[in-house]
């Protein structure tokens, strides 16, 4: 787990050698860009420049596999024509090293060395052979091409922009400040929320390398993104002939393997544990694997008691504390548990840093708890953790999936209820979720978009997250509807599958995986936050060998509705698969969203912090937020205890923090 920053003089501009003064400048710029992400890699730092200084690769290292200098980056091939910087963990690397040993000379034992070897062996198709959490930049001097790629689910972030004739690529946007970038708000992207769907960000001209994509830049061509992988789901009319026991065993085997390969490290490894089934099942499987003889990182003991779990302990009356359940799970497994206490003051003290390092606004406070977890783990000398992200999106853990799971029969599996019962349950689920906020479509909305929205409910659920009170002038960008932006952000193949092939719950899962998960959850509760304290997070539920199998599980085995007592059983097939590894309490417990505290009183620490940030001057300096509506949200959040108002005011405060720390110019209708 590391941080990368790179540049290439942009195609179409002069490729003549850089003069000495300019060469010194680009060296200093790259060095400063690494300073801005130095928290990601305290163990080593490396740089490489082409002879003409038109290309530069920089890397800061957190050493996890191969702690020796031979694992330092950038990596180079033996001929000196191919160079790469890699962030993340690549599994199955030993198999590839053995396979390619005759044609590539490996310098050390680092997993990331296989990137250049696979590229030389397979060409551009090599990315599909990578398994794990990764982002990288590779420069091929012979072909004069730069390749930047990101893992399938966006666990690792990777951004790019063009500034002063250079294509810049980095793990975090803040690195671009070193090259002189002066960020501006992309109000169009903010207003229609396209930054949640496509490659744009809320900064003008700054883009994401999308999950499952690679960026390529060649001489005399503009940089382009291409997909190398995407989610697939079965035809909703195809019968699944497997038994439930067979599918359960298939999930169990693949999840165990995904956990097992993530235990390998030359440093200590721990587990993040909450009260839910996702992290509990991971902890249970780690304990099981230790008993079976699998080493946990560099731990020599094969006793479960050597395993450490870390849990956030919110205030007991906050409605967010799961530490009691986590403690009972730890006792059941016979493992060590460390509780990290988080009261309101502790949350507030981390509010600004969580926003700055995540580089996204998310109207919840669980990211501050995640930052405290990483801090506690780091303090005890642990460099890697196993986490539970990605389970809800694939196994059907969100309430927002309920209506979609019932909007059509599941033709792939024997009926669990009559059609009348299904329709009644669907109507109730739709009402409970308060769908239908989409309103009337304007004549400009294509018929196909209307059809996709009315056959799927989850788009509006995602679009409601973190909505802002926009200033009137922003209407110059049109009265765009975020739900249409989301639907129309998918390519023609996906839209055709949504309309014709996929069950609605699979469409809902696709939308979450492509939008909310990479752009919110994995930034605010994942790598960006963990790496503030030099902790690598590994996500077995996002192992593509597992998810490709789970995506082919019938909807009825993911979300199960009991028409007799009108009850839901979320993640049914996961519960059955992990039953041997969790307590009866966790196995039987209903899904509860993992969120931070949601009620705060006037005059308390959060109210004071928000009041300090959300002033008239600060809001007006954003330029795109209405002050009167913001005042109304402040009143609703703290005086009236309105949940939607709290989320809105938190989002405004986060944008204030981002604007101040990035030095963003005030937005206006004049450009």
UniProtKB/Swiss-Prot annotation:
A single Gene Ontology biological process assigned to it is: asparagine biosynthetic process
**EC number, as in UniProt:** 3.-.-.-
Q: Where's the active site on this chain?
A: 2
* Claim: Ribonucleoprotein is one of the keywords in the record: no
Instruction: Name the GO cellular-component terms.
Output: cytosol
Instruction: Enumerate the transmembrane spans.
Output: none
Enzyme group, top EC level?
hydrolase
Pathway-wise, it operates in: Pigment biosynthesis
**Which intervals hold domain Asparagine synthetase?**
251-639
List the molecular function annotations (GO) for this entry: asparagine synthase (glutamine-hydrolyzing) activity; ATP binding; hydrolase activity
- Alphabetical keyword list: ATP-binding, Glutamine amidotransferase, Hydrolase, Nucleotide-binding
Domain Glutamine amidotransferase type-2, chain residue ranges per copy? 2-220
What the record says about family reads: Belongs to the asparagine synthetase family.
Cited function: Amidase; part of the gene cluster that mediates the biosynthesis of the yellow pigment chrysogine. Pyruvic acid and anthranilic acid are likely substrates for the nonribosomal peptide synthetase chry1/NRPS14, with pyruvic acid adenylated by the first A domain and anthranilic acid by the second. If pyruvic acid and anthranilic acid are merged and released from chry1/NRPS14 by hydrolysis, a subsequent amidation would lead to 2-pyruvoylaminobenzamide. This process is probably catalyzed by the amidotransferase chry2 using glutamine as amino donor.
Q: What is this protein called?
A: Amidase chry2
Organism of origin: Gibberella zeae (strain ATCC MYA-4620 / CBS 123657 / FGSC 9075 / NRRL 31084 / PH-1) (Wheat head blight fungus)
């Amino acid at each position: 787990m590391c941080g990368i920053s790179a540049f290439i003089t942009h195609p179409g501009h002069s490729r003549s050698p850089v003069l000495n003064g300019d060469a010194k400048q680009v060296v200093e710029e790259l060095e400063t860009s690494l300073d801005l992400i130095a928290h990601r890699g305290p163990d080593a730092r490396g740089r490489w420049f082409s002879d003409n200084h038109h290309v530069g690769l920089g890397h800061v290292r957190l050493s996890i596999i191969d702690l020796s200098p031979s694992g330092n980056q950038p990596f180079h091939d033996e001929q000196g024509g191919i160079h790469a910087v890699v962030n993340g963990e690549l599994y199955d690397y030993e198999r590839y090293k053995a396979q390619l040993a005759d044609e590539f000379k490996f310098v050390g034992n680092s997993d990331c060395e296989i990137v250049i070897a696979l590229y030389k062996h397979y060409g551009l198709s090599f990315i599909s052979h990578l398994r794990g959490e990764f982002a990288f930049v590779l420069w091929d001097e012979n072909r004069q091409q730069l390749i930047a790629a990101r893992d399938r689910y966006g666990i690792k972030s990777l951004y790019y922009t063009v500034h002063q004739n250079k294509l810049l690529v980095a793990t975090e946007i803040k690195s671009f400040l070193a090259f002189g970038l002066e960020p501006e708000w992309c109000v169009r992207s903010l207003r229609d929320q396209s930054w949640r769907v496509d490659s744009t960000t809320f900064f003008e001209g700054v883009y994401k390398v999308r999950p499952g994509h690679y960026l390529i830049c060649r001489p005399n061509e503009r940089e382009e993104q291409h997909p190398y992988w995407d989610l697939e789901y079965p035809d909703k009319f195809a019968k699944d002939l497997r038994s439930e026991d067979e599918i359960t065993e298939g999930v169990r085997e693949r999840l165990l393997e995904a956990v097992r390969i993530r235990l390998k490290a030359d440093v200590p490894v721990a587990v993040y544990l909450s009260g839910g089934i996702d992290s509990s099942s991971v902890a249970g499987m780690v304990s099981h694997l230790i008993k079976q003889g699998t080493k946990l990182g560099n731990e020599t003991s094969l006793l479960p008691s050597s395993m450490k779990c870390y849990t956030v302990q919110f205030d007991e009356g906050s409605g967010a504390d799961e530490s009691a359940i986590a403690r009972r799970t730890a006792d059941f497994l016979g493992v060590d548990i460390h509780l990290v206490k988080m009261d309101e003051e502790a949350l507030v003290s981390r509010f600004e840093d969580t926003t700055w390092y995540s580089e996204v606004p998310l109207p919840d406070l669980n990211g501050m708890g995640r930052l405290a977890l990483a801090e506690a783990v780091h303090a005890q000398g642990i460099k890697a953790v196993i986490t539970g992200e990605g389970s809800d999106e694939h196994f059907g853990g969100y309430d927002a999936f309920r209506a979609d799971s019932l909007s059509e029969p599941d033709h792939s599996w024997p009926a669990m209820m009559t059609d009348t019962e299904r329709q009644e349950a669907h109507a109730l689920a739709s009402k409970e979720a308060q769908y239908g906020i989409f309103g009337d479509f304007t004549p400009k909305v294509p018929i196909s978009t209307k059809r996709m929205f009315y056959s799927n409910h989850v788009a509006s659920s995602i679009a409601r997250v973190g909505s802002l009170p926009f200033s009137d002038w922003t209407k110059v960008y049109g009265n765009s509807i975020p739900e249409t932006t989301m639907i129309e952000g998918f390519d023609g193949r996906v839209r055709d599958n949504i309309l014709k092939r996929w069950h609605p719950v699979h469409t809902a899962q696709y939308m979450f995986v492509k939008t909310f998960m990479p752009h919110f959850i994995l930034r605010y509760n994942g790598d960006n936050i963990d790496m503030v304290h030099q902790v690598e997070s590994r996500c077995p539920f996002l192992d593509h060998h597992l998810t490709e199998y789970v995506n082919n599980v019938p909807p009825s085995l993911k979300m199960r509705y009991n028409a007799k007592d009108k009850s839901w059983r979320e993640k049914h097939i996961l519960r059955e698969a992990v039953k041997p590894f969790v307590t009866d309490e966790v196995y039987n417990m209903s899904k509860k969203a993992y969120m931070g505290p949601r009620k705060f009183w006037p005059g308390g620490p959060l109210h004071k912090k928000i009041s300090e940030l959300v002033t008239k001057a600060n809001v007006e300096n954003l330029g795109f937020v209405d002050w009167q509506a913001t005042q109304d949200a402040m009143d609703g959040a703290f005086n009236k205890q309105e949940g939607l108002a709290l989320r809105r005011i938190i989002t405004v405060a986060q944008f204030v923090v981002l604007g101040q720390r990035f030095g963003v110019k005030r937005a206006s209708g004049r450009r």
